[in-house]
């Protein structure tokens, strides 16, 4: 009775408690109001692990990110992370496309973005020797003549623009997405292109221009003033008709013989006009119409990329007359292209710059024809540089190339590190605080209680994206595994490890064993020599190596360092192999250091107070059969707990078997020398292997069944709501006595005994075939399935013994018996446990039998025996309605 009261109190405590101010308000609540007060008991979810995930952006590298999880000391902390969301940063280039009459093709200045330095750099650009000791480091020394310096570098300039000096070009791969946008000329020399200190001698950190005219120097200005990204291609006649129609200042001649004259020879470096003339001329002309050809009349300018051809691997992606797409929202012009094949990106034009002047103006010719600076200056000053047509201008572009499908470089991936940190409070840790490194599949026991923090460190600057991190920590109890492993199993295994080592060392040091080994070696070598001399043995390389190895192993066996050698390179594979396989097979565990930590989540599930409370509620439903389902479930759980005990015992027996076999290793190792005794050595190896494989296979089957059991248990247990458990109805019926009196009534203050009632609908024609998880039919079939799976787990040891025997060919049999059954040490241990607990089981079942006899069957008067009299022998242990002879037969 006390147990029953305790269970009722347990169920009531599981209900939602009332507020402190309303602790006694239920006393004045009506019977119907109690239902809303106590509510329902829901089926619990098995949440022994607190899981979560977080995406950490590489842009926040080095900064600690909160997971929101709290961990407990000594319990499992598991972290898995992936770099699948990491991609390469788009390759960025600044490109200056400029028309210069001294080069047969347009000049293309390329600057590559360096993510490490966060700046654009002109790689391979021919640079001058600069004076870093001056007040403005990086400038040309004032005592040097720019023109004289540039004359000696003309060949370098030619090589640079012809890409013959190894300078980098823009490479596009198949599948790359290319975006080219027009930008202002100032972007090419943007602030993120640092001048100091990283690019001290990189003269492309500022405009290439000089107040002194130098025909052999490079320039980046096209003398269009504020009119960026425009190209002029017009005959001298069209230009002169606008700016010097009377041919009085900068023009001469008429018709096709018209020439444009320039007093400072700036035209030969792409600067045909002074600033004032440019402003005047650009104010007179307009943009050329769409699809306008070369040398349009009247003179006009080309914009939006017209006049420039862009190719990738020889394939044109933007034609001469094609314009960039104008974005109305961003007011920018761009071209978007996905490469179908790879190659080098070229910026070129079909418009020819040759014949602009009557004399040779190509820098390539100058570098070959002039050996000294004086003759070159004389050539420039004496010749007439009047232009037959004007072709000048520039485009400034930014090129971005990316491909989400491209894998990041292995070096970049290896540089990405993840760290975790546990703090006692939720305050954001300082970035200078170092954390613990985390592998891709990381598991450990939390070193302390606290909050979990994660961060990414050391990513390379050329990658971007998010590191995806999944984390989980165990929140359940660990008392069972602590008792089983730390309190029982670990002391046993440690003792047997020590026993195995001591026994082995004593055996090896024993003079009889040493003499046996020496005698065996002597016989082996003698027999081998005689067989070889008489020709009875065909000697091969494999045979020689095999025999030498055998001799070396046995010879090393009797040395003092025998245990250290064999334990390190051989025995540890078996002693540590069991723990290794068990640890790697187990998925969910409470502790990394406790190999039986996987039992804690299982016990958390099957010892959950809510589960047993709902089962007790079902036990009270005798009238509708739910009590039978609850009894099946409880008995199944007890059977399953026994199966868990078998797994534990199986592990211990396997480990003991391994240590015993290892302690006898010297005998079996000696036996491998001779063919007649080698079978004993082979069987010894097979036995060791079987002891390692058996607990592993047993655990695999056990965990698979546990997954199914968890699902079935949640279907057997149903929610329970506060309702009338036993209705109280008072009535009187005298019609059977001929008195016409028949009435019944309920007490308004107590219509029934209230308690939790399972929420299960009655079986009807409408739901008998539906897949409703709460129908009696579904509950009954699920309970039978649950019972079947528990019985299956109970029989796993026998089944695994058969499987391991077939795999390792180790099938020890009894000496006698028709079938020579395989011995089962685990089964023998369980039978001993049964025999010890049998009286307890009988004592527990006796009240149940009495309850069935007196309450359910209403057998108040026991049946009489055939000889007369009432049989009442062993009232609490035997049924009174069964004859003594029948009872003995059943036993």
From Swiss-Prot:
Superkingdom of the source species: Bacteria
Signal peptide: 1-20
Record's subcellular location: Cell membrane
GO CC terms: plasma membrane
Alphabetical list of InterPro entries matching this protein: Conjugal_tfr_TrbL/VirB6 (IPR007688)
Keywords of the record: Cell membrane, Membrane, Signal, Transmembrane, Transmembrane helix
Any GO BP: protein secretion by the type IV secretion system
Membrane topology: Multi-pass membrane protein
Transmembrane parts of this sequence: 525-545, 568-588, 614-634, 652-672, 685-705, 776-796
Pfam families: TrbL
Family: Belongs to the TrbL/VirB6 family.
UniProt-recorded name of the protein: Uncharacterized protein RC0145
Species: Rickettsia conorii (strain ATCC VR-613 / Malish 7)
Species lineage: Bacteria, Pseudomonadati, Pseudomonadota, Alphaproteobacteria, Rickettsiales
């Amino acid at each position: 009775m006390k147990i029953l009261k305790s269970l009722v109190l347990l169920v009531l405590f599981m209900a939602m408690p009332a507020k402190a101010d309303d602790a006694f308000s239920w006393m004045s609540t009506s019977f119907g109001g109690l239902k809303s007060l106590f509510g329902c008991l829901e089926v619990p979810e098995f949440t022994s692990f607190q899981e979560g995930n977080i995406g950490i952006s590489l842009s926040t590298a080095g900064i600690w990110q909160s997971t929101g999880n709290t961990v407990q000391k000594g319990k499992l902390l598991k972290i898995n992370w992936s770099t699948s969301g990491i991609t390469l940063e788009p390759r960025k280039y600044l490109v200056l496309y400029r028309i210069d009459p001294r080069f047969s093709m347009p000049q293309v200045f390329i600057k590559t973005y360096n993510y490490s330095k966060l700046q654009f750099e002109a790689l391979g650009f021919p640079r001058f020797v600069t004076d870093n000791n001056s007040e403005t480091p990086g400038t040309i020394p004032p005592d040097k003549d720019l023109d004289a310096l540039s004359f000696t570098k003309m060949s370098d300039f030619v090589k640079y623009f012809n890409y013959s000096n190894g300078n980098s070009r823009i490479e596009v791969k198949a599948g790359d997405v290319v975006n080219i946008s027009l930008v202002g000329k100032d972007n090419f020399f943007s602030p993120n292109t640092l001048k100091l200190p990283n690019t001290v001698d990189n003269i492309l950190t500022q405009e290439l221009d000089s107040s002194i005219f130098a025909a052999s120097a490079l320039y980046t200005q096209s003398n269009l003033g504020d009119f960026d990204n425009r190209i002029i291609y017009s005959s001298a006649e069209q230009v002169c008709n606008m700016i010097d129609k009377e041919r009085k200042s900068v023009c001469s001649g008429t018709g096709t013989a018209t020439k444009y004259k320039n007093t400072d020879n700036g035209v030969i470096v792409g600067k045909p006009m002074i600033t004032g003339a440019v402003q005047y001329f650009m104010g007179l002309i307009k943009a050329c119409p769409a699809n306008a050809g070369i040398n349009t009349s009247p003179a006009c300018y080309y914009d939006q990329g017209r006049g420039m051809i862009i190719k990738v691997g020889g394939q044109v992606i933007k034609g001469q007359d094609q314009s960039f797409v104008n974005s109305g929202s961003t007011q920018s012009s761009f071209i978007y292209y996905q490469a179908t094949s790879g190659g080098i990106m070229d910026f070129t034009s079909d418009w020819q710059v040759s014949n602009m002047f009557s004399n040779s103006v190509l820098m390539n010719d100058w570098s070959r024809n002039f050996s000294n600076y004086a003759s070159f200056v004389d050539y420039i000053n004496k010749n007439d540089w009047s232009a037959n047509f004007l072709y000048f201008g520039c485009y400034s572009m930014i090129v971005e190339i990316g491909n989400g499908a491209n894998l990041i470089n292995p070096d970049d991936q290896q540089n990405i590190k993840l760290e975790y940190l546990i703090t006692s409070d939720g305050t954001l840790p300082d970035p200078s605080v170092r954390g613990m490194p985390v592998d891709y599949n990381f598991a450990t026991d939390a070193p302390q209680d606290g909050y979990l923090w994660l961060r990414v460190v050391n990513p390379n600057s050329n990658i971007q994206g998010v590191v995806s991190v999944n984390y989980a920590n165990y929140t359940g109890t660990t008392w069972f595994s602590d008792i089983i492993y730390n309190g029982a199993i670990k002391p046993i295994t440690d003792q047997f490890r020590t026993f195995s080592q001591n026994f082995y060392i004593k055996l090896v040091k024993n003079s009889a064993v040493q003499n046996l080994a020496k005698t065996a070696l002597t016989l082996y070598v003698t027999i081998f020599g005689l067989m070889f001399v008489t020709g009875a043995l065909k000697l091969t390389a494999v045979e020689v190596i095999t025999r030498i190895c055998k001799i070396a192993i046995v010879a090393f066996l009797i040395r003092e360092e025998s245990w250290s050698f064999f334990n390190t390179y051989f025995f540890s594979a078996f002693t540590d192999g069991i723990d290794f396989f068990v640890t790697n097979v187990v998925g969910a565990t409470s502790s990394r250091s406790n190999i039986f930590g996987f039992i804690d989540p299982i016990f958390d599930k099957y010892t959950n107070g809510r589960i047993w409370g709902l089962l007790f509620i079902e036990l009270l439903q005798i009238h509708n059969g739910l009590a039978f389902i609850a009894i099946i479930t409880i008995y199944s759980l007890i059977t399953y707990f026994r199966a868990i005990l078998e797994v534990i015992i199986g592990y211990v027996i396997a480990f003991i078997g391994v240590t015993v076999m290892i302690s006898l290793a010297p005998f079996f190792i000696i036996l491998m020398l001779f063919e007649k005794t080698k079978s004993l050595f082979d069987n010894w190896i097979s036995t060791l292997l079987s002891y390692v494989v058996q607990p592993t296979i047993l655990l695999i089957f056990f965990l698979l069944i546990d997954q199914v059991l968890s699902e079935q248990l949640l279907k057997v247990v149903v929610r329970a709501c506060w309702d009338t458990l036993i209705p109280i109805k008072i009535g009187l019926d005298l019609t059977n006595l001929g008195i016409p009196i028949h009435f019944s009534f309920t007490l308004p203050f107590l219509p029934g005994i209230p308690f939790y009632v399972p929420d299960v609908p009655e079986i009807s024609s409408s739901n008998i075939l539906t897949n409703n998880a709460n129908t009696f039919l579904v509950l009954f079939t699920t309970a039978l399935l649950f019972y079947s799976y528990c019985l299956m787990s109970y029989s796993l040891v026998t089944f695994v013994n058969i499987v391991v025997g077939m795999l390792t060919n180790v099938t020890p049999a009894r000496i006698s018996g028709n079938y020579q059954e395989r011995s089962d040490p685990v089964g023998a241990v369980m039978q001993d446990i049964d025999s010890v607990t049998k009286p307890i089981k009988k004592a527990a079942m006796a009240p149940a039998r009495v309850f069935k006899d007196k309450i359910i069957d209403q057998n108040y008067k026991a049946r009489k025996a055939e000889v007369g009299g009432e049989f009442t022998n062993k009232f609490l242990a035997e049924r009174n309605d069964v004859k003594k002879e029948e009872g003995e037969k059943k036993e």
